[in-house]
Swiss-Prot record:
Job of this protein: Specifically catalyzes the cleavage of the D-lactyl ether substituent of MurNAc 6-phosphate, producing GlcNAc 6-phosphate and D-lactate.
Source organism of the structure: Synechococcus sp. (strain JA-2-3B'a(2-13)) (Cyanobacteria bacterium Yellowstone B-Prime)
Protein name per the record: N-acetylmuramic acid 6-phosphate etherase
Catalytic activity as recorded in UniProt: N-acetyl-D-muramate 6-phosphate + H2O = N-acetyl-D-glucosamine 6-phosphate + (R)-lactate
Subunit structure: Homodimer.
A matching Pfam family: GKRP_SIS_N
Phylogenetic classification of the source organism: Bacteria, Bacillati, Cyanobacteriota, Cyanophyceae, Synechococcales
Known pathway: Amino-sugar metabolism; N-acetylmuramate degradation
UniProt cross-references to PROSITE patterns, sorted A to Z: SIS
Annotated active site: E84 (proton donor), E115
């Protein structure tokens, strides 16, 4: 794959051309100055990010999945974001999935040639039984990675939603997806080291997409992660704290209520705020597809 002279991520950075001559303190300040460009580049993509969130959420309401595909750093960031969704938002591991070129081995070491296999992602998506209601997010700093492009083409062929996240535009990726997200962070501190500014931008965008989708799906109440899975002591304490905050209860009362509701944060909150039984709370949640805000707004409207 020849070097593209239009590629920002592969261009030399004049601000760091002699970074090896700087003192360590100056080096740190120079890298920090470059990093400050990243949030602005991401903020400039607010519109397509919001479009992606709404489109993904709409499909997930009807059984669709969110699937990330990437290679190298981009792939690892997708895996990281997908892995955090079950403990944070109580999703099934099958709802948010990440595919990385080279498979699990590529999480900890480079797998030579994996990103150049344009058919590999298509095969992996076929193994997931990709459906039209799924959403596929291709992540590639350059916007040219064959593994990602092949996966996007496979997704488009069956009518799945396609989203491209790249730090170059125009690029083959951003030009063939339904929604293009392109935070242009400029040349890297070290030429071509896209684990730096490009990777940081990708992480911020993925954070926003997954969090925004889960908020739209009712996985939060305010800023409380009310669908979390309390799988360890820290998360159990967090669940108790969320019930206490949402219902203005002391810690002991919140813990007791949560235990009585089998550890279900949403159920406990509704029991406290609505004065109903746990079973009634579960029924309300089922009718509202788990959206606690929708349940409370509906009940308040009926009581007016």
């Amino acid at each position: 794959m020849a070097w593209d002279p239009r590629s920002l991520t592969e261009s030399p950075n004049p601000a760091t051309a002699e970074i090896d001559r700087l003192s360590t303190w100056e080096l740190v300040k120079r890298i920090n100055a470059e990093d400050r460009q990243v949030p602005e580049a991401v903020a400039a993509q607010a519109e397509p990010i919001a479009q992606a969130i709404d489109a993904i959420a709409q499909r997930m309401r009807h059984g669709g999945r969110l699937i990330y595909i990437g290679a190298g750093t981009s792939g690892r960031l997708g895996v990281l974001d997908a892995a955090e969704c079950p403990p944070t938002f109580g999703t099934s591991p099958a709802q948010v999935v990440a595919l990385i070129a080279g498979g699990e081995k590529a999480l900890t070491q480079a797998v030579e040639g994996a990103e150049d296999d344009a058919e590999a992602a298509a095969r992996a998506l076929e193994g997931l039984h990709l459906q039209a209601q799924d959403s596929v997010v291709g992540i590639a700093a350059s916007g040219r990675t064959p593994y990602v492009l092949g996966g996007i083409q496979a997704a488009r062929s069956i009518g799945a939603l396609t989203i491209g996240l790249a730090c170059n535009h125009p690029s083959p990726l951003t030009e063939q997806v339904d929604i293009a997200i392109a935070p242009l962070v400029g040349p890297e501190v070290i030429l071509g080291s896209t684990r730096m500014k490009a990777g940081t931008a990708q992480k911020l965008v993925l954070n926003t997409i997954s969090t925004g989708v889960m908020i739209r799906l009712g996985k939060t109440y305010g800023n409380l992660m009310v669908d979390l899975q309390a799988s360890n002591a820290k998360l159990k304490q967090r669940a108790e704290r969320m019930v206490a905050l949402a219902c203005d209860l002391d810690p002991a009362a919140a813990a007791q209520l949560l235990q009585a509701c089998d550890g279900e944060v949403k159920t406990a909150i509704l029991v406290a705020l609505m004065g109903c039984s746990a079973q009634e709370a579960r029924q309300h949640l089922q009718q509202a597809q788990g959206n606690i805000r929708q349940v409370l707004d509906s009940v308040l409207a009926q009581r007016r």
